[in-house]
Amino acid sequence: MVSSVTGPYVTAPGSAAYAAAKGGMDGMMRTIAFENGRFGITANSVAPGWIATHSSTPDELTAGHHTPIGRPGTPDEVAGLIAYLASESASYVTGQSVVVDGGNMIQEPHGVDLYDTDDSAT
């Protein structure tokens, strides 16, 4: 399953429905892993962060440059992890959500006004 860091790990204003859906996907993945592990079936999710795609907005691409890696990820980097999780080499990996975000979640947000308290516009 492809989930997202938004929802299971982080959130943003206005993303309640999206975050709930992605968080729900991870809960479903863990249940599938638990119920089917005895049959040799694994279930995992991949949680991409800032990935440069054709649908990325300029702001999303800029945000990707603020990761510790210093750039947005690529679809091929996400696909590589998916290929590994689908391979026999990952046969003992199940029930996990693996983050692919260039280390973005390990840093504290700086300069982010989460509560829009800038009174200079009034």
Where are the regions a protein language model picked out?
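Residue(s) in the substrate-gating loop at a strand-loop-helix junction
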Residues: 4
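Alpha-helical segment proximal to the catalytic Tyr-Lys
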Residues: 34-35, 91
